[in-house]
Structures are given as C-alpha cells and as structure tokens.
Amino acid sequence: MLKAVLERTIGSKSKRDLKDYLPTLRNINKLERWALLLSDEDFSKETEKLKDELKSGNSLESILERAFTLSREAARRRLKERPYDVQIIAGLALHKGKIIEMKTGEGKTLSSVQAAYLNSLTGDGVIIVTVNDYLAERDSNWMKPVFDLLGVSVGVVLSNMDYELRKAQYAKDITYVTNNELGFDYLRDNMRYDLNEKSLRKFNYCIIDEIDSILIDEARTPLIISGPTEGNTNAYLEVNSLVSFLKECSKDSKTGDYPLEIDDLDGDYTVDEKAKRISFTAKGLNNLEQLLVSKGIISGSMYTDSNFNYVHYMTQALKAHLLFLKNREYIVGDSGVEIVDEFTGRVLTGRRYSDGLHQAIEAKEGVRVANENKTMATITFQNLFRMFNKISGMTGTADTEAKEFHRIYNLDVVVVPTNRLLARIDEDDTIYYTEEFKFNAITDEVYKTYKKGQPVLVGTVSIEKSEILSAMFKSRGIKHEVLNAKNHSREAFIIAEAGAKHAVTIATNMAGRGTDIKLGGNIEHRVRKKIGTNVSLEEFQEAVKNEREDYLKDYNEVKSLGGLYVIGSERHESRRIDNQLRGRSGRQGDPGRSRFYVSLEDDLMRLFAGDNLRSLMGKLGMATGEPITHSLLTKSLINAQKRVEDRNFEIRKHLLEYDDVITKQRDFIYAQRNSILEDTAIKDRILIALEEYLTFLLEGAKSSTVSNVFLNEVNLIFAYMLEGLGSIENINSLDLKAKLMQIAKANLDEKENSIGRDLFNGFLRYEYLRNIDSKFQEHLANLDSLREAVYLRSYANKNPITEYKEEGFLIFSELIKDIKVSTIRRVLQLKLDSNSSNFKSVKKSKNVNSIHKELSGIVINENKSVSNVQVVRSSPKIGRNEPCYCGSGKKYKNCHGKS
C-alpha cells in the first residue's frame, strides 16, 4: 500500500531514473551536429582522444556524451539506423548498471552499442552475453561495422572454438559470447596446468541479453564440468523393470492430498509434482527390498554399503516414469534422450540430467544407458556474474522480477517506453473445465481467423501439446507450421513467414527466440526465396529495393486485418514467459491481439489454482463445456502465477545460500592454483608447507617426546628416507623436526640438480595442481552428500544451511591439509630417473563434460601440460584401489596397474 502511495506521489524508481537521463539525452542530441561533420577517418581518431583522456585520469562520465554521440552517428552511417532517443536512454541505463526492459522490436541490440563502446575505452574489455551461439554470431557480425568505424575491436566466442582462438576473441575490446561458454571457460581456465592456456582476462563489464532468462530461469541449474566415473549402469535397467510393482499412496478424493498421518499412507511412495520429488514410505522400502531380493538383484539386506544405492536408483526410475515425460521434458532422437529447454522449447544438445536421472530415463526409453559422471568443477550463473565489476542487462520482460534482481544482484529495472504507442489488444483469459473443450475452442478460433487471412501464432508449453493441436488443425484443413524441438532446423524459415497473410504457426515457448515476427513476412527472406543465395551483396540489395513495393502492400493488408493474433494455449508458471509470447504481437506500434485459453486440467491450474478457480467459476454460474471470461478469473490466474514465482524465488535464494559456501571455498582453491601457476620456486613452497605441518603435529603433542600420531604421519610422508636415523621414538621432537627438514631439503635438492631447476619446478607444479584438482573433486562430492544429509536435520529443528556452513568449513579445513600432505608425500617419495636426457613435453588429458545441472553433457578435452619427467617408484607400492600415479583419476588397477 505504502509503495503504491509513494509511486503516485513521487513516481516509481524506474520513472525517476528515466527523468534523470533526460538532461544527458538533450546534450547528446545537441552534439549530433558535431558528429555529422566528422569524416569516417575521424572516428577512430576521436576514439583515441577519449582513451587518452581516460589515461590522464578523467572519468567515463566526463566523456560519456561524446562517446554516445559518436556511436550513434557510426550506427547511422554503417547500419542506416539512427538510434532513437529511447534507445539512447536505454544505453545510458545500461552504462549505469541497470536492467532495461524494452518491448519486442524496439531495438535492444542497437541500444547496447553505446554502453559497450563507452566502457570498452578503458581497455579492460566488455563482454556481451547472449543465450545461444546463433545470436552471439549474428549480433557480433551485425554490429561489427559500427565498432570498426569507431576503431574498437569486436570478437565472438563460439562453442566449436579451441582455447587459443577463444583467448584471441576475449582479448578484443568487445566480445560476444553465450552464458554457458563464458561459465565453462571460467571453470576450464581454473583447471589449466599452464597459465598460457587460460583464455579469459579479468572480468570487467558485462551486458547480458535476455538477462531474465539467464539470471532467473537458469539460476536453479548450476554449470558443472564433469568426468566419467565407474557407475553401475546395469542397475538402472534392473530397477526400471520394477517400477510397475510399486504403488503410489492413495490421495483424498476431495482435496487431492495425501493423508497427514504417516500410518495412514497405504502405498509405497508419494509424488510431489511441484518439487519433482519422490519419497518412499516405510512400507515402500520394505517392499523394494523384498523385490530386489526376490528378483536376484541383491542378496542380503538393502541397507548394506554395497546395496543401499538401489534406493537411489529406484527413486530416479520412479522420477523418470512419473515426473519426466517424453515430448515434454525431453525427446528421443538420433542421439538418444535429448533434453528440451522448458523456457525456449529448444533441444539442449549435448546436455544430460545429473545424479543418475538421465540414465533412468534412458532405461525407461530403451536406449543405451551411458555412464554416470562425477563433478570436477561447478558454479552457478548467480555467482559467475557477481564476479564482474559491473553488470547490466536487457530483456523484454524484467519488471515482474524487479524485486529478485534488486535483492540478489542489487540491480534496478528501468522500463524504457516504446518509441511508438502499443496498439495491441490483450483480451481477458477464456477458461474451460477440461483441456478437450479448450483445444476445440482454440481450433474454432484459429479456423475463423485463418479464413479471414489474419496471421496467428499459437503458443504451447510442450511438444506433446503442439502435436495435439497440429493434428486438430490438420483435420480442419488449416495449413500451418509447427516450431518445436523436433524441427528446430526450420526455425528461421518458420519465423520469417509467421507474420504473412493466412500464416498459422504453432510454437513451443517463444522465449529467447531472438527473431522478430514482421507483418507481411520478412522482406529479406522473400527475396532469398526468389533469387536464391548465390548472388552478390549488390544484387541482393537491388532485389530488396524492387520487392519493397509488394512487401509494403502485403504489410498494410495484414495490418488492416488486425495484425498478428497471439493465442496462448496454456498459462506458463512464469508471467514473464506469457508476456514474451504476447510481445511477439504489436511490435513498433503495429496492431495486434492476444488471448490465453486455459482449462482447469492445465498443470498450473491443477497444482496451484484449481480449487480456488473452481469455486469462483461456480459462483459465476459456469457450466461444464461453457467458456467463461472474467477479469476476476484473470486476476486469480495471475495470483497463482505470483505464488509459483515466489516459490521459485525462494528455491533460487536457497540455492544461492548453499552455493555461497562453495563459492568462498572455490575462490580460495582457484587463488591457490593461480599462485602455483605463477610460482617459480615451488620447492620452497613445499618445504614451508612441510614445516608448518610438522609444527602443527608437534603442537598437539603433550611432551617433548614424539607422539604416536606424529610418528605415524612421519612414516607415511618420509617412508624409506628414515633409514639410517635409527629409533626416532627417542629423539627430541624439535631435533627430529630439524632433521626431517634437512632430509626433505636434501631430497628435493638432489632431484632438482638431477633434471634442472626449471624442469623440476614444472614437475612440482604439476604434482601440486594434480593433487588440488583430485582432492577438490572429492570435496565437491562430499559437499553434495553433506547437503543431502543436512536437509533431513530440519526435522530435528536444526537450520540446514547453518549446519552446512559449519560442517562444510570443517571438511574444507581437512581438504587443505590433505592437499599439502599428499603433495609433500608424493614429491618426496618419488625418485626421478636422470638417465633420460630428452625430457619431452607431455600432455595430461582427461575426458571431461561440461554440464548444466540438472543438465549435463558436451564432451570436451582438457589438455594440461607439464614437462616429461620419468618417474621410478622406490617407495611403498600403490594399492590396487588407490588413484593411479599418472593422474588419470582412475583407480590404479584400471589404469597402469593393468600391465
């Protein structure tokens, strides 16, 4: 209430920001005459002048107006597009570190040019993040002529580039890259064994396109780099055959809820569709154990170490069957099970669900079950982008999430007014009792509109729903196109024609499509259809000029029919996704219309609003099969969406609290790695670490004599090197420490002399980094297990996040100690063979996958170099189940132990 009163009195924060930019806008407009008189050659000279001013101590604010004026004129000359005043305002907001909300077709891409150019002048680099490779490449090529004229370099990072090319692209003044590639490059850089192989430079300023998609929709799914592990893939096939033997608990027929008392649960498991969780009852666990034993899958108790994983396998199998549906969450293609992005409807090529879920789905669908992966490095987008000195973003729909942007990222949203008034008519929702009645009504409405000639875009939430509607349209003789994950290769063609007369398009989620639907169709696409692609640029431009008259005729005809009619076949969980669908109509002042058709059987209604709406519809006198349209119902739907959005916000906030623990630890580990990569005297670092560890052990002793703990640790570290010291139990502890340090120094000096200082330093660096990486990977797995364990402590009235922080700190302290001790032990106990005079460069390769959890996949090769040192073992033999000495990450018996 207070917020509403304040906004009426002094205006919203967004409106106040807009007013603050007006004086600067007026000054930029006045400077246009100066820019018009410049020759093309003058632009790069002016850029150098601005850079010199910054070097002499001036601020970005002091050169802002000239920089914006130059970039505006450069766009006019190279793109034949002069940025509107609203686009200049958007650029100012981006420079100030705000999120701009601009409607579809208002020119977000061009708005970013001014802010990117200004901030690139510091020489620290600007990164522009997009949601896919296509948009990164398109936007960089589109804006390159502008940046070239201004004399600043522009690059693009694509998924198929190697690290050398990536490094060159990141070194440019302005770099376009996807959020996934940027995140994986950060993780990969912190797994390198050579400083020269790092591709990124220090994070400075970042502009995020479709910022709501990246920082909100994808915030629940961390990026993960993973490697293969020895998993029991056959177990997923075994438990898949048991799904039908287990029964879900009965629900109350009126409320649709399970009984509150545990004793009243009559089945084996419960299903939480909202949280996508399966929970076994005590009875269910007993039945599962009996099934596993009777089928010969296990012998003995299910609760032994070797058998307990079957509870996890069975849980994932039930999830796969009950919560993850074909043609909704995934499709089965030539590559097996492929995940469909719930927000964009695109296939997420190469990605896999984590934690065995993908294997469970593969078993369900009867395709080859691949091995599980282990986490090697991970980060969330939230913490990735919080590392930048300044971030800003662009989207067509951010205002609904303004609270979250401010609370999590300290980013304010500025709603930029449209250049022309919005002419689209947004109708109230039409609501039906059943999905069947709803689909029939949509088909009738589309048929009427199709016959009239008005283009229609029908948005669906899944492939399954798009195919149902497609079949119904076909039976009515409605010619149409379907855009979903199964035929995404035709996306450009389908979108180009979606605004033409009589066009009917069914699309699964239009979020992040990145292409405007133009009334009358796309003129460039029309020309390409007529003259083909094998023509010169001049011939193409001439053909476009000749086609313009016919195109304008078609444009005006479609405009007179009412423009693009957008029909939503279902409300999405997020209002933003609905607004993005609506936003495809009414671009740049064009007419348009939108309406959502909803049924009480839709997922959103069933899970979050069903009972309330049923009651309200009864009061409004609605009969089964009859539609009803009322502002109260639309408000009720929006309130249901708000509840889901609030719930999802809490999930993202919760994830961030846990990830903040990992972030502090990851930052420490990565700082250690960087320090070691730069260190030219790692021998001294190891000796210091040894002395600190021996001191730590002695501090725990109660007398001047050595303790058993001290003796055990010393024997583990020094092994054969203690020969000749006699009985060390009787030596004074301080004297023993001094002798041990002498032995260690002599040991390392001898090895250094045998192969040379530089080569030895490289060997030590490799060993130190290898130990850091392998131990940190184990640590990440331990944190995963800890997180699951503390979740259950909430039942004992304990705060899970507090427990996680406290215990996470303890195991991290152990990790730091383990890294040092295992490194010291290894470098001391290995003898280097100095007989080989030719130490060639060796590459340490690992197969690792880049994963977006719950998604995963994309196999990449990490090459980690270190000079070749022949190693001869003369200390205790490696156990068959210990990690192999080569650093492959495999057990010794499965690697060099085979031979």
UniProtKB/Swiss-Prot annotation:
Cofactors (names): Zn(2+)
E.C. no: 7.4.2.8
Cofactor-binding details, from the entry: May bind 1 zinc ion per subunit.
Residues that coordinate or bind Zn(2+): 884, 886, 895-896
Organism: Borreliella afzelii (strain PKo)
Coiled coil: none
Subunit (UniProt): Monomer and homodimer. Part of the essential Sec protein translocation apparatus which comprises SecA, SecYEG and auxiliary proteins SecDF. Other proteins may also be involved.
Location within or outside the cell: Cell inner membrane; Cytoplasm
Gene Ontology CC terms: cell envelope Sec protein transport complex; cytosol; plasma membrane
Keywords in alphabetical order: ATP-binding, Cell inner membrane, Cell membrane, Cytoplasm, Membrane, Metal-binding, Nucleotide-binding, Protein transport, Translocase, Translocation, Transport, Zinc
UniProt protein name: Protein translocase subunit SecA
Superkingdom as given in the UniProt entry: Bacteria
